[in-house]
């Protein structure tokens, strides 16, 4: 299907969709920095080193990487909307879990939960933008998508550190969890804008290639290289968890 044959989509609908996707994406990036601004408080609260706290970030991003790969298949099967809602709910749950944590290992557990929630956003966002936004506005859509992600990064320390200073790090994380669920509620109100028929569009007169299937991407060498790198990181981390637990940063 060419640009000329695509049905015209009202600009207002595209703007609404781009705003909703951008809002969700900002929470994804916001949640990537849930813990980092609170490291000074968490270090004292759990009697751990900055190296151990840094490991929580590694856990989060490794899980996100793996889930992002797998969630693309789920989005293709179920559509982006339910996957997006699940991701936001998991991020909110993880923030509340962090706030209630009583041990380092509880923080590690909820880092996994947050990583799963964070891993769904790019497959969801790119599917919605590519399938629903008119081609003439794709540049604007991806620009807003990137900008809102950066704004989410900026918001996290600006919101969490003052709340931790005024109240406590637990209150700061509870507010972060509430924010995720507020955004989820907004997206639920506008859920029809996020609906998508996952029946694959077919080009008129185009022959179907029986050799192309869902797993055809596994023929690409770069995919296997990426998998090898991720597995290497996982193995290295598995052998170093115990060592990191015993590591304390040397005085400056």
For every predicted segment, state its role.
Residues 33, 61-69, 153-154:
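Residue-level signature of mid-helix packing/kink "hotspots" within the transmembrane helices
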Residues 110-149:
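Cytoplasmic helix-loop-helix junction between adjacent transmembrane helices
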């Amino acid at each position: 299907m060419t640009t000329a044959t695509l049905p015209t989509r009202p600009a207002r609908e595209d703007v609404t969709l781009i705003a909703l996707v951008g809002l969700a994406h900002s929470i994804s990036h916001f949640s990537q920095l849930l813990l980092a601004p609170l490291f000074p408080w968490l270090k004292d609260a759990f009697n751990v080193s900055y190296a151990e706290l840094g490991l929580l970030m590694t856990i989060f991003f490794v899980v996100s990487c793996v889930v992002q790969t797998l969630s693309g298949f789920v989005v293709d099967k179920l559509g982006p909307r339910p996957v997006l809602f699940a991701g936001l709910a998991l991020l909110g749950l993880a923030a509340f879990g962090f706030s209630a944590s009583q041990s380092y290992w509880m923080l590690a557990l909820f880092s996994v939960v947050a990583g799963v929630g964070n891993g769904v956003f790019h497959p969801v966002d790119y599917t919605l933008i590519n399938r629903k936004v008119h081609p003439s506005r794709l540049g604007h859509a991806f620009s807003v998508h990137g900008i809102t992600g950066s704004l989410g990064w900026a918001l996290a320390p600006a919101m969490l550190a003052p709340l931790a200073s005024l109240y406590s790090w637990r209150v700061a994380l509870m507010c972060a969890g509430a924010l995720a669920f507020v955004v989820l509620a907004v997206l639920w109100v506008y859920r029809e804008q996020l609906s998508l028929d996952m029946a694959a569009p077919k080009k008129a007169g185009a022959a179907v290639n029986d050799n192309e299937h869902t797993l055809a991407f596994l023929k690409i060498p770069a995919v296997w290289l990426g998998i090898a790198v991720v597995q290497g990181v996982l193995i290295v981390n598995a052998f170093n968890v115990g060592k990191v637990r015993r590591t304390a940063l040397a005085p400056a």
